[in-house]
Amino acid sequence: MLTTTTRRHLLTTAAAGVALLATAPAWAELPPLKQKEKYKVGFAQTESNNPWRIAQTESMRAEAAKHGIQLVYTDAAGSAAKQVADVKSMIAQGVDMIFLAPREEKPLIPAVMEAKRAGIPVVLLDRRVDASLAKAGEDYVTFIGSDFVEEGRRAGEWLAKTMNGQAKIIELQGTVGSSPANDRRTGFAEAIKQHPGMQIVASQSGDFARDKGRQVAETLLQAHPDATAIYAHNDEMAMGAFAALEAAGKKPGTDVLIVSIDGTRDALQAVADGKMGATVECNPRFGPKAFETLARYAKGEQIEPWVVNTDRFFDQSNAKDLIAEAY
């Protein structure tokens, strides 16, 4: 039989436990990562059909090799369903951590949650998942990437200034449902809304691909032959737009001004040659920050919910000098 003193002690202990849980930081709910000599880490890439993704993968592989880490690499080939299956395979292989570049915001939520249930921490690279369904510090460790809204805003501000606030714009969007496409569209729209003469006359997805960007640009240029500018969510679609403009008998950089995002070697060369107005960098070299984050997390450090990549801006003033650094 419990004495009054014993009951009071148990109640006090229980109350303290509840209070501790209530005040525990969200990151404490994440699966831990033990410090050890060698890790087996998964990298679930979304695709590998463009220079940006190739550069990102090369950076991850090089940094893993530098630290003696076994990298389990998968390529979803642009399929969210395959990427979910890739993550499940990594879980089955017992990886210590998963770096995930999610194809789209919503479809990859089940993969993130399944990894958490399996006790495997996840770090998102380049793209986010839907924040209403999964949160950094609770369901995954952190997001490492650029500020896509700011990228779109910088592109819009440059175009508005260069065009003196007057332009009929064709927008080539990225993959529907992806965070960079959503955010780059938002940032650009915010920048040009201050200029009534800046009008988006057509906007359609080119899926971040050169060929599809060309096809979409051809269709939209036929529908809007008076367009004076093209805003592409990435450089690959901008390259496709060059071909579409030339096929329409228009001169890129003269008849139609193009602004884009990524900072690839092809884009910087086009800017230097006067074919393209400007491109906002989106740095693909994630390896150093990714594996630095792994090391910090293994030490028990609290990781900020967003590890920000800083990006440069390329135009006629610097593109030629920086081509050698591009990918």
Regions found by a protein language model. Give the residues of each.
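A residue-level marker of the well-folded mature domains of exported/periplasmic proteins
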Residues: 28-327
